[in-house]
């Protein structure tokens, strides 16, 4: 099992991405970082010698790569799609490494990229019964779609209340696969 984030999440939140359960096993950590901007001082890099950590990148900057390797990170070279990592290519690389289960703990840009490149099979959503409106952050940013028929559909299969929040698990149905 692995957990994946984008470089912006590392820069903004400095997560550790470890298991919080007593005697739990830490997931493999994957940072999608097209241009190698992950701070060497981040928690994820500082703990890379103890917890398997991959940096997925399109960069060939050997001096930066050497710094990450010195900290214990392994590098996954991926193709580029536009200005970002080709996530489908990354999924193929991870599959070749026997990593077949992945939790995307992404920010809105990473979430959109993953949905746009159709690498998401299911989503787990927590919804708080609050309305923010205005310019509040959204869980998915990016280009979006112009027409309702082009929207990515969610087919819920589990729904529960957790405290005051709602938890929904859904299968992702992409437009070309909709009935």
Predicted regions and their residues:
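Enzymes that bind and transform nitrogen-containing heteroaromatic metabolites
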Residues: 1-179
